[in-house]
Amino acid sequence: MTWHPHANRAKTFLLLAVFSGLIVAVGAMFGRNIMFLAVLFALGMNAYVYFNSDKLALRAMHAQPVNEMQAPVMYKIVRELATTARQPMPRLYISDTAAPNAFATGRNPRNSAVCCTTGILQMLNERELRAVLGHELSHVYNRDILISCVAGAMASVITALANLAFFASMFGGNRDGGTNPFAILLVSLLGPIAATVIRLAVSRSREYQADQSGAELTGDPLALASALRKISSGVERAPLPPEPQLADQAHLMIANPFRAGEKIGKLFATHPPMADRIARLEAMAGRGPGQY
């Protein structure tokens, strides 16, 4: 199977290009020294996240590894999908929580893990579970962890630039160019917000792509639509607790793990609107397998 993100890939790269332009613009305003420190900081921090993304996410969810005897249905489905995609079998984990969700993590297919909660395993039938696991495997095969880390690094650069420039202005300003202190204050306030908005837009774009790629892998977009409906209502009944370490991993989940009332708007959402995702999957089913 060939993994091709279609229009969502173009959208992702466009957003990353906007990120790059924002970094250059902000860096030019504050000078090379501050920009160098910000880039160095961001690269170091996100390199750590990239190489340890699986450990961080699995630890936050208190996930435990499982084998074929412990989770026969989940193991069978993942093995079949990995074989279909001609990709390595990921490590499998289960998180003992009633909150219905699933996520994939790992820097590449050979170093990947897929985790389901006990809540989602109890809620979905086998067809729906297969669709969810296809979605999660697509995140791995489309290298979404790498893309997420690149977007995160760029956001960190902009935030670090804004913070460093703000403190530099407090202790003598920008000696290289005499930048207006009001401009520094404005960028210090708006830069991190803009970076967060773009990073979350990248995350939402990757969710749309995983829905599409997962439906192509399983050949059953309606099963994923059905699963998303159940997960959405299930999260309202049994959300994850709003703890900082869980909030940091929310973008990895197949659905926002917190109640809808706790969202603060589409621009700051980690996931696209559930109704929109379901509508797209139903449209895929209407086109037929040969025209996805």
From Swiss-Prot:
<dbReference type="GO" id="GO:0005886">
    <property type="term" value="C:plasma membrane"/>
</dbReference>
<feature type="binding site">
    <location>
        <position position="207"/>
    </location>
    <ligand>
        <name>Zn(2+)</name>
    </ligand>
</feature>
<dbReference type="InterPro" id="IPR050083">
    <property type="entry name" value="HtpX_protease"/>
</dbReference>
<keyword id="KW-0862">Zinc</keyword>
<keyword id="KW-1133">Transmembrane helix</keyword>
<keyword id="KW-0472">Membrane</keyword>
<dbReference type="GO" id="GO:0008270">
    <property type="term" value="F:zinc ion binding"/>
</dbReference>
<protein>
    <recommendedName>
        <fullName>Protease HtpX homolog</fullName>
        <ecNumber>3.4.24.-</ecNumber>
    </recommendedName>
</protein>
<keyword id="KW-0378">Hydrolase</keyword>
<feature type="transmembrane region" description="Helical">
    <location>
        <begin position="33"/>
        <end position="53"/>
    </location>
</feature>
<keyword id="KW-0482">Metalloprotease</keyword>
<dbReference type="InterPro" id="IPR001915">
    <property type="entry name" value="Peptidase_M48"/>
</dbReference>
<dbReference type="Pfam" id="PF01435">
    <property type="entry name" value="Peptidase_M48"/>
</dbReference>
<dbReference type="InterPro" id="IPR022919">
    <property type="entry name" value="Pept_M48_protease_HtpX"/>
</dbReference>
<keyword id="KW-1003">Cell membrane</keyword>
<feature type="transmembrane region" description="Helical">
    <location>
        <begin position="182"/>
        <end position="202"/>
    </location>
</feature>
<comment type="similarity">
    <text>Belongs to the peptidase M48B family.</text>
</comment>
<feature type="transmembrane region" description="Helical">
    <location>
        <begin position="10"/>
        <end position="30"/>
    </location>
</feature>
<keyword id="KW-0479">Metal-binding</keyword>
<keyword id="KW-0812">Transmembrane</keyword>
<dbReference type="GO" id="GO:0006508">
    <property type="term" value="P:proteolysis"/>
</dbReference>
<feature type="binding site">
    <location>
        <position position="135"/>
    </location>
    <ligand>
        <name>Zn(2+)</name>
    </ligand>
</feature>
<dbReference type="GO" id="GO:0004222">
    <property type="term" value="F:metalloendopeptidase activity"/>
</dbReference>
<feature type="binding site">
    <location>
        <position position="139"/>
    </location>
    <ligand>
        <name>Zn(2+)</name>
    </ligand>
</feature>
<feature type="active site">
    <location>
        <position position="136"/>
    </location>
</feature>
<keyword id="KW-0645">Protease</keyword>
<feature type="transmembrane region" description="Helical">
    <location>
        <begin position="145"/>
        <end position="165"/>
    </location>
</feature>
